[in-house]
């Protein structure tokens, strides 16, 4: 049976994960009148609203994911923490998954990611994988990994969690147990990202390079800005490396690749995620095709869309204010919406907590500097709080 919704009236696109990325994928699919089913463990998952079918269930449970996928003609992910074996079985039964389960097995584990980069000659910072924190401590006692270094949990990290820049022995001794890796610090000048889409027929589309500025304490993306500050040759090199990674993996769907740029201008692949990414949200307002629509197109055997930016843009995350946890209230939303060129996206999460991603805003302008100023003004006008009882 064809996997195109325009030739199969029974076509349903399955989205595994019902958070904000799932919600934006749902919107892209519904705009083309594609039926969507959503799987998520939370009863208040943002992506449940507007879905043709919503199912509650654990994303890491083999049977749950398998049975959900069997009711779909194509399956996409909004999160890596999904049972990859279920995806492999779905593919064996003729249901394409984006990404394939075999690719997910690599990318959902940072240690496997780094090993893959090294195996295929892709530039990445020097690293060592450890099965436990005790093994890392033993290696350090023998002289390896003097301070400072970067510690990463092999699994379970997101939005800055599971990554620590270790500067003191106290920090080193407080690291949690589990499979992990130690990584050398890059003499960092800039962090950038690239999204690449690839169809089952091998068609590819590469998005413009975006700059990422991080919050100094939350380790979350604070601003994403396009066009990049990188010289054109360096930006083209980042796009080529991202494309090489996609093709080396045999990935179909969407891959978001994060890079470090050192002070000598060298590019180092940091991490890759086989799904839409925070660094690509700007594409909703300022690109010919959004990252979400592009993944929907790839998963539905549709031609990929154009990736040219039609304006400068800056995206700022809307996160929970420190000291506030509970039912969410948005202070200053009207002020944000009154600003020219600023687009506000709220994800539908009912509860806020410090630094939780509750939404984002994107500012478009003629220049990157102006877009960033607008995004900063919008972010500063909005506070994500709880109301006093």
What annotation goes with each model-predicted range?
Residues 237-257, 263, 273-325:
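Active-site "cap" helix and flanking loop/linker of ATP-utilizing ligase/carboxylase catalytic domains
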Residues 1-115, 134:
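ATP-binding N-terminal substructure of ATP-dependent carboxylate-amine bond-forming enzymes
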Residues 99-163, 169:
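A conserved helix-loop-beta module that forms one wall/lid of the active-site cleft
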Residues 162-264:
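Internal nucleotide-binding/catalytic subdomain
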Residues 9, 297-389:
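Peripheral (often C-terminal) accessory segments that flank ATP-dependent C-N-forming ligase machineries
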Residues 184, 281-284, 361-364:
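Short, well-ordered beta-strand elements within core beta-sheets of diverse protein domains
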């Amino acid at each position: 049976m064809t996997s195109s919704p325009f030739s199969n009236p029974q076509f349903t696109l399955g989205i595994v994960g019902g958070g904000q990325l799932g919600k934006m994928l749902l919107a892209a699919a519904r705009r083309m009148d594609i039926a969507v089913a959503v799987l998520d463990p939370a009863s208040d998952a943002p992506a449940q609203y507007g879905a043709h079918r919503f199912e509650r269930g654990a994303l890491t449970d083999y049977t749950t994911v398998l049975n959900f996928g069997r009711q779909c003609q194509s399956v996409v992910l909004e999160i890596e923490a999904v049972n990859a074996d279920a995806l492999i079985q779905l593919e064996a039964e003729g249901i394409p998954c984006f990404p394939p389960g075999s690719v997910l097995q690599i990318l959902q584990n940072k240690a496997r990611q780094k090993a893959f980069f090294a195996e295929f000659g892709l530039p990445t910072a020097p690293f060592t994988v450890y099965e436990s924190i005790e093994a890392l401590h033993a290696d350090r006692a023998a002289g390896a990994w003097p301070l400072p270094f970067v510690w990463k949990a092999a699994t379970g990290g997101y939005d800055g969690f599971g990554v620590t820049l270790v500067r003191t022995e106290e920090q080193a001794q407080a690291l949690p147990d589990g499979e992990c890796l130690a990584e050398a610090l890059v003499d960092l000048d800039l962090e950038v990202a690239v999204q690449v889409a690839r169809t089952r027929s091998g068609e590819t589309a590469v998005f413009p390079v975006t700059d990422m500025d991080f919050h100094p304490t939350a380790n979350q993306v604070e601003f994403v800005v396009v066009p990049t500050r990188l010289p054109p040759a360096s930006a083209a090199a980042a796009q080529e490396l991202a494309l090489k990674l996609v093709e080396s993996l045999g990935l179909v769907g969407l891959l978001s690749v994060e890079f470090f740029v050192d002070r000598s201008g060298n590019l180092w692949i940091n991490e890759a995620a086989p799904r839409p990414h925070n660094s690509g949200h700007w594409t909703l307002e300022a690109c010919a095709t959004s990252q979400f629509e592009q993944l929907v197109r790839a998963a539905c055997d549709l031609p990929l869309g154009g990736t040219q930016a039609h304006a400068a843009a800056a995206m700022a995350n809307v996160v929970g204010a420190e000291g506030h946890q509970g039912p969410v209230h948005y202070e200053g939303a009207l002020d944000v919406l009154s600003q020219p060129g600023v687009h506000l996206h709220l994800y539908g999460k009912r509860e806020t907590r410090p630094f939780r991603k509750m939404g984002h805003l994107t500012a478009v302008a003629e220049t990157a500097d102006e877009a960033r100023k607008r995004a900063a003004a919008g972010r500063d006008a909005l506070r994500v709080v709880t109301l006093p009882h």
